[in-house]
From Swiss-Prot:
Encoding gene per record: opn1mw2
Start and end residues of each stretch annotated as Disordered: 328-349
Native source organism of the sequence: Danio rerio
Residue ranges that the UniProt entry lists as topological domain Extracellular: 1-36, 100-113, 177-202, 277-284
Keywords from the named record: Chromophore, Disulfide bond, G-protein coupled receptor, Glycoprotein, Membrane, Phosphoprotein, Photoreceptor protein, Receptor, Retinal protein, Sensory transduction, Transducer, Transmembrane, Transmembrane helix, Vision
SUPFAM superfamilies: Family A G protein-coupled receptor-like
Cytoplasmic side: 62-73, 134-152, 231-252, 310-349
InterPro entries: GPCR_opsins, GPCR_Rhodpsn, GPCR_Rhodpsn_7TM, Opsin, Retinal_BS, Rhodopsin, Rhodopsin_N
Domain of life: Eukaryota
Membrane topology: Multi-pass membrane protein
Protein name: Green-sensitive opsin-2
One cellular-component annotation, GO: photoreceptor outer segment
One BP annotation, GO: phototransduction
Alphabetized GO MF terms: G protein-coupled photoreceptor activity
Protein family (similarity comment): Belongs to the G-protein coupled receptor 1 family. Opsin subfamily.
Amino acid sequence: MNGTEGNNFYIPMSNRTGLVRSPYEYTQYYLADPWQFKALAFYMFFLICFGLPINVLTLLVTAQHKKLRQPLNYILVNLAFAGTIMAFFGFTVTFYCSINGYMALGPTGCAIEGFFATLGGQVALWSLVVLAIERYIVVCKPMGSFKFSSNHAMAGIAFTWVMASSCAVPPLFGWSRYIPEGMQTSCGPDYYTLNPEFNNESYVLYMFSCHFCVPVTTIFFTYGSLVCTVKAAAAQQQESESTQKAEREVTRMVILMVLGFLVAWVPYASFAAWIFFNRGAAFSAQAMAIPAFFSKASALFNPIIYVLLNKQFRSCMLNTLFCGKSPLGDDESSSVSTSKTEVSSVSPA
């Protein structure tokens, strides 16, 4: 056995040397050098300083500008709210614990941090799924002439919270549990042990199949169909330069969206699956911490991809930041209307 299981924790190191100590009571500098904990704290501070303001600004700008409160934008606001939860309740705890070198808030604090980090991450993940489905419905029109309304948008948001809760809540009530992971300064579901008391095995199988495989399949299908539809429409209007430009923009955005999703979740899910199917195998605390870096970074690059690259949101943000006077003048506003025209022309009639 290459790990040590204790009361609500698992350390990826054998206790034959007698070095292993509870991550709730003692610094974990035997797992990694102190500077690595400080580097992790700096990384979390970076995400807090940049991720939290971008997500909060998205919420503020949407509240200030009525034209942003359109049904197709609701899910972007939900995505920003999820990022805010991750940054405020998750990143701040990891920052504090990394500075101290151990899970300084104890088992209860670990469970709370693990819950909010998982909830925010899952809301963000399912928001990307709903966003992909919404765009698929609007552009590909699988249901014919379908009017996307506020009720549909709110149903999509409710769906993200139901799915996220079905993943984040069970460990609080005995189906799996939240324990320190990586360098023992942040918490997540228990992938590491086969403790029958918590039915970890069934929970991990459920989480991997329902909360990773299903989203990946859905995103690849919907965005793949969207690109094919846009390319087919552009091929029928080859004489239109605006249509060709819109097709290229849509393709680039889809590639960015899919890559962003894969970068955020594939490393974490893959390593967690490897741990699950190789119980007792040797791995370092840093090896588990690195994939978590990518999933946490989604709170920063999701709003960049989905909000800051959205011309309408970007224009309103600049107006808000510069007190109603965008430094880009009228160009940005005009590009918004142009973008709308291009997208509608690419969409099949």
